[in-house]
Amino acid sequence: MSSINPSLYNDNGVYCSKVIVTKAIKIRDLDQIPQTVLALAATNNGANYDYASPNYITNARKRFKARLNRNPIWYPKMGDTAAIFFARSDQAGWDIRAEVDEAILYTQKQYPHIDINYAVLTPVNTHDLVDMNLIAQLFAEDDAAAAAAANQPNQPNQGQ
């Protein structure tokens, strides 16, 4: 079914930089699935979250809705078909892969129709989850592109 892309890890088993985050978000454009991306925040802020707990999902919604200041996209809505996972770690040596794996397993169990494309982490010791301004900018670009495409007259398919 779904799996973590091993190319997202560096030699130390730690997820790569924000460049990878950018590419992961842009998968919405590549797959032409705007507004169908689920990003579930698998975070550690000094507390141990039970990833199978509804409270974990609820808290993640509140936290990231406030930070992104846009419609939440990190939990399943009607029509969601794909997932991107974000996580962070404040401690060197924290098993950040297991942190995301737990959330992936929960999502696969609760929402089997969701196709998990990427699991993305910022480097260890990064204070912020990711560059939220960057993410908001990319979402805005995607939304603008989708709006522009919606205003174009339908082009006939050629050779298909």
Swiss-Prot record:
GO biological process: aggregation involved in sorocarp development; positive regulation of gene expression
Keywords: Developmental protein, Growth regulation, Repeat
Membrane-spanning parts: none
Sequence repeat start-end pairs: 151-153, 154-156, 157-159
The UniProt record lists the keyword Transcription: no
Location of the region described as 3 X 3 AA tandem repeats of N-Q-[PG] in the Swiss-Prot/TrEMBL record: 151-159
Function: Unknown. Its expression during growth is not required for growth but for the proper initiation of development, therefore playing a role in the transition from growth to development.
Protein name per Swiss-Prot or TrEMBL: Vegetative-specific protein V4
